[in-house]
Structures are given as C-alpha cells and as structure tokens.
Amino acid sequence: MRALVTGVGGFVGRHLVHHLQEEGDEVCGVSRSAGALNMAATPVSQTDLNDLSAVERLVQETRPDAVYHLAAQSSPAESVTNPWGTICNNLLGQLNLFEALLSADLHPRVLVVGSSDEYGQVRPEDVPTNEDAPLRPITPYAVSKVGQDMMGFQYFAQHGVAVVRVRPFNHTGPGHDARFVMPSFARQIAEIEAGMREPVLRVGNLNVARDFTDARDMVRAYRLALVEGTPGDVYNIGSGRSVLISRMVQELIALCSAHVEVRVDPALLRASDIPRQEADTRKFTALTGWQPRIPWHTTLRDTFEYWREKVREEKLCAS
C-alpha cells in the first residue's frame, strides 16, 4: 500500500511511519518543516498544506492508496493564545487535501484524526464516553478538530471520499515534546535530577483524570482504522482507563534519584478544565480486535528515560 502521511515530522508521525514500514507499506511523508527531510528511508516532501497548488502537485506526484492526515496545530493551550492560526491551519490544510484528491480523480482511503477534546465538557453520565456523546468543545483546538471531523464526513457524504474518522484520547511516549503534560513533567524532573533547575516541579490542576495510550499502540490503531474501518464512520481510540494526573506525577518522581517538591503554578491552571476523560472503545475493538499492548508503567518509564537522556545531552553541550 502506498501511504501518504501528513505531519510526518511530528511526534505521532514518526511513530506512524516506523509502524507502516514494518507492515510493508511504501511511505511518503509531508512536512511544512525542513527538519523532517532527513528521515531515514522515507521520502519527505516539504509542502505547505495551506497552499492548494502545492497540495495538488503533491497528490499528483505521490498518487497514494492511503492518506493519514496528522498535520495540525496540536496544542490546546497554544490554541487559546492563537485561535486564528489554529483554526485556519487545521481546517484549510485538510480542505486543500480533499480538493486536491478530487481534482486528481484519486480515490484513496483517508484517515482524519480528530481528538477526544471534541467531546469537551462531558456530562458525568457520558463517562466512559462513546461516539454518540454530544460534542461540546471548550478550546479553539477542539473546535478545529470538530471542524475536521465534520468536514471528513461531509466529503464522504457529498463526494464519496473513503474517509474514516478517529477520535483518539490522550497519547504520549518517548519523543513527545514538553508542551504536553507527561513530557513536561518528565523534562522538569530530569532537569532537577541533573541539577539544572531548582528541585521544584511546577504543575497545574492535578485533580483531573485522563485516558492515556502509548503512541506506539495508537499508530497500530490508526492503520487498523484506515484498513478495516467503515468509510463515513467514526471511532474512539483509547485505553479505556483514566489516570489521575496526581498519580502520574508521583510515579514519575519515583523514577528519579532526586528530592522533588510539587508546587502548583497558577499560570498553568486553565480557566475551564475537563474533570475526567475516559474512552468507550467497544465499537473500535469489536471491529478490529485492537487493544493496547504497552503497559502504563512502560510508557511512563520510556518517556522519562527519553527526557533523562535528552537533558544529559543538553548539559554536556552547555558545559
């Protein structure tokens, strides 16, 4: 299968490319950044998805059988400070991709990656959350993901594009950048252990619970969704278990050799937060048989070890 992966230079994109190649797929990546051009054994096109003519050239040159659309501004916090950029980037790039496929008369299967944040302020009776729960987004990022989700359905319904939509819950692992909760804590703790910052871990609201899946399991689910999913349908992907952020913090601290004080930073508290997210994945599991394979403690350890090594390298470079 010839697969086109947008956002190939991102955290999930790199894991997905590795998995697709293991499955024997021929992969072409797309990235706005030149930094992704050096990916081993993967041709990468530096293409701005907001440029329709560039996207048209891309699909004509690659003629994919499968499209994994991962490219997006993916930080909810960043979307609050830059709603214009988030919504324009996330919607226009996908719109251009669909229009380019129609213009080229190509008919690949397309995976549109939404987010559990689409569900937003979930009612207590809707946890665990299934695909029929109402969408009540509370950040510009979440609004953009609802837009991508609905656009995917519209192009399926109106134009017959073989779109499969997924709503992944939180996913993390080694290589995840420090804008996000687990890698942010892991980096801070690694810096404390290395003597590069005061022994204080700055945190936001620790009394919320999130459903975490290892990214290496998530990308397996993405390929299964694209290959086995029903065009026009939508699937939740997650572990089906929620973890308190306070528990995550304590387990990360236990992995390091330093004393760490936990301190709430008011700047990290959100005006509105979702108390608990937990996926009901029965629909996707019944279709594909997918289950997470990597235990929570392994994801936690691997993420911390990634940042421990990265911090060591940074310390060496600075000395």
Show which residues each predicted segment covers:
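Rossmann-fold cofactor-recognition segment
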Residues: A41-D51
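NAD(P)-dependent short-chain dehydrogenase/reductase
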Residues: V122-P128, M150-D211, A215-R223, G240-S242, ...
